[in-house]
Every structure is written in C-alpha cells, then in structure tokens.
C-alpha cells in the first residue's frame, strides 16, 4: 500500500447501511452514525458552484429561498430538513422548471460521503442550469443532524 492509499482505506461496508444518522431514543441529543457507506466527495461540487454550510442554509430557509433535497426516496429514512423541497436526483432534470433560475438554490443530500447532490448539480449543469445559481450544502443530513439542528417527518 502506498502512502496515498493508506488515507483512503475505510471501514468495510455493512450489509444494511444506515445513510441518515439515527436518534438514540433513550439519549436526548445523541445520534448514531454509520461510517461504512458512501464515497469520499470533493469540497466543491463543480467549477462555479459555491459550497455553503449550515448558517447559509438557515438564512436561505428564513428568507424563503429554495433548498432542494435531492435524496432518492429510499435514502431519506423518513426525515428531512423543515422548509426544504424534495426533488429526487432521478427527477431533477425532468423537474428543472420547478427551480427558480433567478434565485440561488441550495442542493443537499445525506452528507459528505453521499454523491447524490454532486451528481444532481452536474446533471443540472449539463442541462444548462446556471452554475452561479446553484449552491452545494456538502454537510447534508449528516452534519445537520450531528449539529442537533431540527428535522421533520418526510411526507414527500
């Protein structure tokens, strides 16, 4: 193993992975995180795409601006960030007209190890969506939940 490979070695993937952190029912404020799934992602989704954190997501939601959850239905685990709109990655290009090209839109998925939002951004770029109007929340559900920020039941 060369020096570069030793930093990429990860825990073996479990048979049934849990992509969204789980609240530990009897321990308020504690979540369990499964580190055995996913891919290592870059900090920037693509050239011209701004990467944002939780404060920007909160401000976007407070201002009534769009925050899009691109997670496939089977990867949502029944929860989402309140105020977000679900447009699964499989539908993102078909539903491009639901996006407001005049306002910055934040896209997110399950977190730093989840490729869904980066892939969705690349699909939208290829479809002609303006890079300067797409922001990438790399932390996704993983960071949102591990910071103790509120989530709601996902009925979409």
Regions flagged by a language model, labelled:
Residues 85-87, 135-137, 152:
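General small-molecule cofactor/ligand-binding pocket signal
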Residues 66, 71-88, 97-99:
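Mid-length scaffold segments of soluble, non-membrane domains
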Residues 93-144:
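Catalytic cysteine-centered active loop of the rhodanese-like fold, especially the PTP/DSP P-loop
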Residues 63-64, 102, 147:
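Structured helix-beta-strand junction loops
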Residues 1-75:
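Flexible, polar/low-complexity N-terminal or interdomain linker segments that lie immediately upstream
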Residues 53, 89-96:
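Alpha-helical scaffolding within the catalytic cores
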Residues 80-82, 130, 147:
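Short, structured coil segments at secondary-structure junctions
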Residues 148-156:
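Active-site neighborhoods of enzymes that stabilize oxyanions during catalysis
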């Amino acid at each position: 193993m060369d020096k570069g490979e030793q930093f990429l070695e990860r825990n073996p993937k479990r048979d049934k992975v849990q992509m969204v952190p789980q609240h530990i029912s009897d321990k308020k404020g504690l979540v369990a995180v499964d580190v055995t799934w996913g891919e290592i992602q870059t900090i920037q989704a693509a050239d011209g795409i701004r990467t944002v954190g939780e404060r920007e997501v909160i401000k976007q939601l407070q201002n009534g601006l769009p925050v899009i959850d691109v997670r496939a239905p089977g990867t949502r685990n029944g929860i989402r960030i309140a105020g977000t709109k679900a447009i699964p990655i499989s539908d993102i290009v078909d539903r491009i007209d639901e996006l407001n090209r005049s306002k910055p839109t934040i896209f997110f998925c399950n977190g730093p190890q989840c490729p869904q939002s980066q892939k969705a951004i690349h699909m939208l770029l290829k479809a002609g969506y303006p890079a300067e109007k797409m922001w990438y929340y790399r932390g996704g559900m993983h960071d949102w939940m591990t910071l103790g920020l509120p989530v709601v039941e996902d009925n979409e």
